[in-house]
């Protein structure tokens, strides 16, 4: 049976709860949801959806890189928006990173941690 391997990098925000930044299992990396915390400051700095989405993508990129993967190997993403009115602006940022158009779900939720506007998680191959 394949082992679970935890992924951790200081180039993305530390988990704010009892979970790992990502887990590798059987040749696949499963990231936890990333929110737009700047890992250098520990703060959410951007106030608009585009800025927050960019920070989320930077964080995800670092987690994927540490795991030995990247955006081009994404199989599935799950995206959470605080307001579906931000859908188009979010997609503009998302499309710059996920150029292979992986499977995706995108939903609006009532509240996200730290009252951010966006959170994204990824399943990717190694």
Residue ranges: model-predicted function:
Residues 2-126:
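Short, polar/acidic, helix-capping and beta-turn segments at strand->helix junctions
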